[in-house]
């Protein structure tokens, strides 16, 4: 194992030892008006801390439903972001987050919180600072040159397949994606597949 990959392995182990929470969201889209429609948080042992659909403020576009399968009917009686914001914030402050593509999910958490006037609390302020990006760690581990911070980014399902992590459930659903992220970090902590 190279010195770089040994360091990456140590960082992955630290995330697991620190009992970080692994988080994933599904959303209404990619833009500045997108919001969260599903969120899952699991601990480093895979225990589900929170797994819920989230009722958005506007209809879910067909393009988003085509990716994650979440429909307006499914979220009709789900809690709103305002209902779960406190629980998510509490887990964040207690454990910190590991997210595959942290920039995206933290932006969507902020955008969704802002819709309810919750963007100015300490949670949203510290979100980027205390969220570790599993995608960036994996990109560094693979070491393939790319245009994003010097490394090629890998899709979650591709990274999971490369590391021998099976998909439990449907990819592009928050619980399955959390489990894949945890599996990738666990594989890196053990030295990775390559």
Swiss-Prot record:
Residues 20-185 form the Exonuclease domain. Its EC number is 3.1.-.-. It is an enzyme of class 3 (hydrolase). Keywords: Exonuclease, Hydrolase, Nuclease. InterPro entries: Exonuclease_RNaseT/DNA_pol3, RNaseH-like_sf, RNaseH_sf. Coiled coil: none annotated. One of its GO terms (molecular function) is nucleic acid binding. PANTHER family: DNA POLYMERASE III SUBUNIT EPSILON (PTHR30231), PROTEIN NEN2 (PTHR30231:SF4). This is Uncharacterized exonuclease CP81. It comes from Escherichia phage 186. The gene is CP81.
């Amino acid at each position: 194992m190279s010195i770089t990959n040994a360091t990456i392995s140590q960082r992955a182990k630290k995330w697991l030892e620190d009992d970080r929470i692994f988080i994933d969201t599904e959303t209404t889209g990619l833009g500045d008006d997108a919001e969260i429609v599903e969120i899952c948080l699991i601990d480093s042992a895979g225990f589900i801390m929170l797994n819920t659909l989230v009722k958005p403020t506007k209809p879910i576009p067909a393009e988003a439903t085509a990716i994650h399968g979440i429909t307006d009917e499914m979220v009709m009686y789900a809690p709103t972001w305002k209902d779960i914001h406190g629980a998510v914030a509490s887990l964040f402050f207690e454990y910190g987050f590991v997210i595959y593509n942290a920039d995206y999910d933290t932006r969507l958490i902020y955008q969704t919180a802002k819709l309810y006037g919750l963007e100015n609390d300490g949670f949203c302020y510290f979100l980027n600072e205390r969220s570790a990006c599993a995608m960036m760690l994996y990109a560094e581990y693979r070491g393939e040159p790319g245009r994003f911070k010097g490394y090629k980014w890998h899709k979650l399902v591709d990274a999971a397949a490369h590391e021998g992590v099976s998909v439990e459930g449907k990819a592009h659903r928050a619980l399955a994606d959390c489990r894949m992220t945890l599996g990738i970090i666990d594989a890196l902590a053990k030295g990775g597949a390559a």
